[in-house]
């Protein structure tokens, strides 16, 4: 039965998100001094600590974190919660490893995307274009999973159809992302992160009330499924699963492009430090808390999986329906829908930047043409809208098991970008040949093993992908580094198109700045000096 009471909180939330996107866009237009591209794709590098932390958390915490993960915890037990605890490290590692270096490098280069940095460091259009392609492919897979998860949850709780849910929240997220750009996405992410926390608290209260309190729930679980109390769940949580999931959703998430680009958008080191500390606490409470609720729901949903539709993705929707009155259920689903929205909006912006900044604008710069801001604005918004529409169409026929789709995309992005980004920022001897071999070889190995179901010692295929990518990165770079250094020594000044050059002619200087969306800057003698300065650079 259709429920207006369950629908109303969702509509109110979406309306607030849209209003925030519009206001953020107008503020950005007034405050921006770096052109449309810098404003639309990285918010003119102006994020404060709270917004920085919340936009990163909301981007990382997808609908899988609220639906698929807790559903698995209902099936496995507290072992899944112990595995999820590694997500506490996500922001700490991201900001600690990438935060300062990426901010310094991107400011000196005038870079607004991860691909900009890769292109400048390795002097390779092929590598940059391949990076953009991989981003779009894996981001699209992730976005489909978010659309499906959000629409399924909406349908289950409100009683409206799956397609109606897809139209309402899918249409809303595409519209406000198109309007708001990076700044709008960042501010709506802060709203989404807050909504996720509220949703967790409401659901926790509902589960504890319906189950007769924490002690009664634990007694029920102990009586019905004693193995759920054990770390290894009598074989359901082998050590190999712990190890590989810790790599996949914890340690190596620092290299996900959608998270790394946040390191280009913050205002100063104070924002970075405060975001690191507060964000680590919030993401820990959020990810451990919502996964633990999945386990506790086994004290309320005591039947077998077939009774709940045969999929773990149905567990949290069923828990919300059975534990909460309709109006509170509407508030509770705002949390996971916010998780879906925040992830989709961030991935849409990153995918749009791959087309506009990394492919189209770069090609125009190669041909000596500048593109007016008005044209860039229209094109960026049209691409964002078109990508959202394509993902929407793909989500109409929903795939099953959302968390598996999400983990596949995580693994592909980590394999492709981990060693390429680390080599770019921290290893002088990394070469474009090594980066190409790493990205191509590692990604192909990962995808082939996933398709064939091939594992080594029961470990997830991410281990194979990362290992192959690492060996190729180091081996090929060492073989080609001497030649690369010799070539570098012949360069008097960098010829990277990512870096706006200081040109004596005023009209050319203005055109270059307009095309890149940044102010003209004086270029050092070598891009290597930007990435590996003799004296440590200071970010104020």
Spell out what each predicted region is.
Residues 1-540:
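Membrane-embedded helix-loop-helix hairpins and adjacent transmembrane boundary segments
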